[in-house]
């Protein structure tokens, strides 16, 4: 199946239509996150999947937010700035989203 959004699975970022693989928490990962051209990725996790999007605050700073759709509702979790978005932070956010979605 064809996909357009970059995916994070098994500790690696996979670019669509490319053999490029970037290990999470590597300098290349943080550079990819900081690149203005990259605004979203899909994150697959045992606690559930989400879409992470880069958004701009009113002050002009960029940060990442995880989104999941459940029962017609959108649940989101703040991920942080590009330089702070580690694999551990992503996993913590997925567990938080899973707990919150279970209460809906």
Where do the model's predicted regions map?
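A structured, charge-rich N-terminal accessory region that forms the first stable segment of a protein
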Residues: 2-15
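Short, Arg/Lys-rich segments that mark the N-terminal edge of DNA/RNA- and chromatin-recognition modules
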Residues: 3, 17-21, 30-80
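Short, surface-exposed linear segments at secondary-structure transitions and domain or protein termini
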Residues: 83-93
């Amino acid at each position: 199946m064809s996909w357009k959004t970059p995916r994070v699975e098994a500790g690696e970022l996979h670019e669509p239509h490319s053999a490029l693989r970037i290990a999470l928490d590597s300098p290349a990962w943080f550079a990819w996150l900081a690149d203005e051209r990259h605004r979203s990725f899909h994150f697959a996790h045992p606690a559930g999947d989400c879409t992470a999007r880069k958004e701009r605050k009113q002050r002009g700073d960029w940060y990442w937010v995880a989104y999941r759709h459940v029962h017609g509702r959108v649940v989101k979790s703040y991920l942080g700035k590009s330089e702070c978005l580690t694999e551990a932070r992503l996993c913590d956010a997925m567990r938080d989203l899973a707990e919150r979605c279970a209460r809906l």
